[in-house]
Amino acid sequence: METVTVNLVSTPAQRGYPIHIGANILTQPELILDYLDQKRVAIVTNTTVGPLYLEKFRADLSVHGMVSVPIVLPDGEEYKNWETLNLIFDALLTHRCERNTPLIALGGGVVGDLTGFAAATYLRGVPFIQVPTTLLAQVDSSVGGKTGINHPLGKNMIGAFYQPQAVVADTSTLDTLPDRELRAGIAEVIKYGLIRDPAFFDWIESHIELLLRRDNSILTDAIKRSCQHKAEVVEEDERESGMRALLNLGHTFGHAIENAMGYGNWLHGEAVAAGTMLAAEVSRRMGMIGEEDVDRVRNLYVKTGLPVIAPNLGPEKYLHLMGLDKKVQGGKMRFILLENIGRATVHADVPAAILTEVLTECTADA
């Protein structure tokens, strides 16, 4: 088992939490017992993950005297909304869960985001633990404290920063992950190489076949290195007032794609990949990177089985949706662009003509 620690500095105390990574660690409840302040927990999962892991997880906890309240949600990005959030609140209130009743998120990014937001707001804050079961959640969404729900007008527009007490990433759960979900998770792994670690990008290029074959040692290494990058960024900028925005490479375009195409039709990682290609092309046309770098990014996505051409929504639709992006400041859209493979920067001065050209010439009818 590998452990990465997120160290958060705040006044007057320093906070932190572990990210445990390894095979079959879901069967080791002792990893989280220290964070359970009472003998009752609420476990939030969904209709896909629940049948696979919920009852065994509950049984392992019960050996240590823990009573668990199961909360099973419908599965899918389209359910990341107020109605589903209220299902969690209804269950917590019905079972009279208290302020020190921990919530455990057992599932992918949607379950984690919903559970975290419920934990941040139920009784004005209760403890929660992330147990991510998808690659995307293990390398990205379970770490850093971003929680929330979607709104019909925009993705993740309602939420809170609320850190978990621990993250338990069992790589064995990836054995039951559909291939499409695995590829979508690799998109977020690639992102770390693009924004801050060229050697990691090289490593992904040379190990992509093993990642796709789910080689456990390679997956564990990729998850650990991704979490190390995420932890370092979050430690420096917990509330996304500066460098944490770089983690949104491809997301400005990608969130617009997810919204326009209907939540759940494009997986988040798929939209991020297509969005990153648009960001790379904007970077090239602004003279920041060369065609060779754009080709490297495209080729890696193609090898991964990710989309490299964004849907043609029309420039007006894209610009409207991106105008609702959380990074907008003073009415100006801010884009994460590439200076080279391994370095990204934030830009609020992208010429409208270049944006329009890219959104016209580099998209295709879905």
UniProtKB/Swiss-Prot annotation:
Q: What is its EC number?
A: 4.2.3.4
Q: Which reaction does it catalyse?
A: 7-phospho-2-dehydro-3-deoxy-D-arabino-heptonate = 3-dehydroquinate + phosphate
Which Pfam family would be a valid example here? DHQ_synthase
Has the keyword ATP-binding been applied to this entry? no
Tell me a GO biological process for this protein.
Answer: chorismate biosynthetic process
Comment on bound cofactor: Binds 1 divalent metal cation per subunit. Can use either Co(2+) or Zn(2+).
- Location relative to the cell: Cytoplasm
| Identification of the protein by name | 3-dehydroquinate synthase
